[in-house]
Each structure stands twice: as C-alpha cells, then as structure tokens.
Amino acid sequence: MTEAPSSASDTEAIDKWEIQLRKGSLGLAVLASLWGGKLYGLEILRTLETGSDLLVGEGTIYPLLNRLKAEGLVQSEWVEAEAGHPRKYYWLTDEGRDRARRMSGVWAKFSGSLNQLLGPLKAGGDQ
C-alpha cells in the first residue's frame, strides 16, 4: 500500500496535534527532569532536549515552573553563582514526587494501550 501525499491542511492538522501532545506531557517531563535533584531553568531545558524530541523554549518553561510551584509541586530558591548572575534552582517537593509517580503510571498505561492499538499501523497493515 502506498501512502497518499499529504495536503497542507493535513500537515497543519498533524502539527497542531503534535503541539497539543507536547503541551499535555510537558508537566510530567519537567517533574521527571527534577527527579534527580535541583536544577536551574536552563539545565531543565537542556535535560528535556538531551536524548529527546522535547524542544521547549524559555517562554514555555518558566510559566510552567511557576504553575508547578503554585500547585506546591516544586520549590525554588535563588543561588548566587561564583561567576555571573544568580540562578534560580528548582526541585521537587514530596507532593511533586508523588504527583510525578502517579502521572508516570498513567502515562505508562496510556502509552502502552496506544502502542498496542498502533501495532498494526507500525507493521504496515492494510486494514
């Protein structure tokens, strides 16, 4: 079976869907990035970009960190750097760790179910 050429509207629809998918999973990704301990904002961005396809800008990450802080999932503090500007470090609260565990479980169940449904597509089935 050959693939039909994609139209501009189809490509746009897929792009919008991908944006929504990223937005929906970014909170979990940030919580997971903080699992190992304190990181400042740019370190979080680098962690998300390393070995993944999660390209996130500063205009996205800082409002998200503020929301996670308002929800009591992360804490932050300014730390003077030996050279350069002070950096704001973020880390998970106990509630943040619990939320990350629970979200990870939901994600594993959801992605497992979806991968099972996608099996025939990945195998190139015609039906």
Where do the PLM segments sit?
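Basic, amphipathic "hinge/linker" alpha-helix immediately C-terminal to the N-terminal HTH DNA-binding motif
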Residues: 82-104
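Short beta-strand "wing" residues that participate in macromolecule-binding interfaces
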Residues: 76
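N-terminal helix-turn-helix DNA-binding core of bacterial DNA-binding proteins
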Residues: 18-62
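Short, hydrophobic-biased segments on the C-terminal half of alpha helices
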Residues: 62-69
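Intrinsically disordered, low-complexity serine/threonine- and proline-rich regulatory segments
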Residues: 1-25, 103
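Glycine-centered, phosphate/nucleic-acid-interacting loop/turn motifs that mediate DNA/RNA or nucleotide
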Residues: 72
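Amphipathic alpha-helical dimerization/coiled-coil segments
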Residues: 3, 98-127
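Short polar/acidic secondary-structure junctions
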Residues: 53, 79-81
